[in-house]
């Protein structure tokens, strides 16, 4: 039995080597076509080979060929062909029911970073990639993919969309560093506290206490316009500091007094009290209001934050009116 198993393993290794060799030979021919400028013919050949490999259940070969082809087309400025092959990479992942792995997420983030930021293909790609990365366990997408997308968007200085993806990652430190840059580059000095306050409140609405604490600590330590604290000069920052302590304690009386005492600061943004209603329910046992199914603006904001549908998520990441946009 052991000998038979060893022989089978060796045969499998030989077949795998032959398959890789075959893919490499085909890839060489396709690369030569692209180098010559025969973009259309090369694109059609990539598609033909993709469906041939998929029909033979050679999902990994199909995926690797489409990924390398997409990178090749991107390097030659062929955005449409590259985006099409990128979507085929996703199709191979979906149909093969491949488990989520860091390398795959990094590959998806790589092609995302090369896509034209204003192209509709990018919107479709990120929505579909996040849906696949959720693995059927949720609607928000894998935190690592969100982090990689956030980093790319940050480099593009697309701070609003970057913040959305940071909120759904576990990278509180990265989020804070991005917010420091966003605040100093685009914000008013009088609003330095509001940038981090909204991020903390939204992390708490997503039940992510750890990232809420990290983003607050990192932001207040690194922002050049915030003096050392706590306590802080800005009352709103003191409120957030006390709130994070109260969340750990879970005492409703403390939460209630805190919200009452800091109402002048909380009135600076009408959404603060709405977020705090939700935080009260999540961490302090506050019963939902009679109109528990939030309507109007808040309903849209919270459903988007909590990922009520994949479609909404894809749209949210491209919409400047998203719930995570700071005033």
Swiss-Prot record:
Cellular component GO terms, alphabetical: BAT3 complex; chromosome; cytosol; nucleolus; nucleoplasm
Domain of life according to the entry: Eukaryota
Modified residues (N-acetylalanine): 2
Any GO molecular function: protein carrier chaperone
Localization annotation: Cytoplasm, Cytosol
Keywords of the record: Acetylation, Cytoplasm, Transport, Ubl conjugation
UniProt feature, compositional bias: Acidic residues: 310-319
Region (Disordered): 307-327
A biological process from GO: tail-anchored membrane protein insertion into ER membrane
Pfam family, one: GET4
Annotated spans, Interacts with BAG6: 195-271
InterPro entries (UniProt xref): GET4, TPR-like_helical_dom_sf
Post-translational modification: Ubiquitinated by RNF12, leading to proteasomal degradation. When unassembled from BAG6; ubiquitinylation is modulated by BAG6 quality control role and effectuated by RNF126.
Subunit structure: Component of the BAG6/BAT3 complex, at least composed of BAG6, UBL4A and GET4/TRC35. Interacts with BAG6; the interaction is direct and localizes BAG6 to the cytosol. Interacts with GET3.
Function summary: As part of a cytosolic protein quality control complex, the BAG6/BAT3 complex, maintains misfolded and hydrophobic patches-containing proteins in a soluble state and participates in their proper delivery to the endoplasmic reticulum or alternatively can promote their sorting to the proteasome where they undergo degradation. The BAG6/BAT3 complex is involved in the post-translational delivery of tail-anchored/type II transmembrane proteins to the endoplasmic reticulum membrane.
Family, per entry: Belongs to the GET4 family.
Protein's UniProt name: Golgi to ER traffic protein 4 homolog
Primary gene name: Get4
């Amino acid at each position: 039995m052991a000998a038979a198993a060893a022989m089978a393993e060796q045969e499998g290794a030989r077949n795998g080597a032959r398959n890789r060799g075959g893919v490499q030979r085909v890839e060489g021919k396709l690369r030569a076509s692209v180098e010559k400028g025969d973009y259309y013919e090369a694109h059609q050949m990539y598609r033909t080979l993709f469906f041939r490999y998929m029909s033979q259940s050679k999902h990994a070969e199909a995926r690797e060929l489409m990924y390398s082809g997409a990178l090749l087309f991107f390097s030659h400025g062929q955005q449409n062909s590259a985006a099409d092959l990128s979507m085929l990479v996703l199709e191979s992942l979906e149909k093969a029911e491949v488990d989520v792995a860091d390398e795959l997420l990094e590959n998806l983030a790589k092609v995302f970073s090369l896509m034209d930021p204003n192209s509709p293909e990018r919107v479709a790609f990120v929505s579909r990639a996040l849906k696949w990365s959720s693995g059927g366990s949720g609607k928000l997408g894998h935190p690592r993919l969100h982090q990689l997308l956030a980093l790319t968007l940050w480099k593009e200085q697309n701070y609003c969309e970057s913040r959305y993806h940071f909120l759904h990652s576990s990278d509180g430190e990265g989020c804070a560093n991005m917010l420091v840059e966003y605040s100093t580059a685009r914000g008013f000095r009088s609003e330095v506290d509001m940038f981090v306050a909204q991020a903390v409140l939204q992390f708490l609405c997503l039940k992510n206490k750890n990232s809420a604490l990290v983003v607050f600590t990192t932001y207040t330590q690194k922002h050049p316009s915030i003096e050392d604290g706590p306590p802080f000069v800005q009352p709103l920052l003191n409120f957030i500091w006390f709130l994070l302590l109260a969340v750990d304690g879970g005492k409703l009386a403390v939460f209630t007094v805190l919200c009452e005492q800091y109402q002048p600061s909380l009135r600076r943004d009408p959404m603060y009290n709405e977020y705090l209603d939700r935080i009260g329910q999540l961490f302090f046992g506050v019963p939902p209001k009679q109109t528990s199914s939030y309507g109007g603006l808040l309903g849209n904001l919270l459903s988007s934050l909590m990922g009520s549908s994949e479609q909404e998520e894809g749209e949210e990441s491209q919409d400047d009116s998203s719930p995570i946009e700071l005033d």
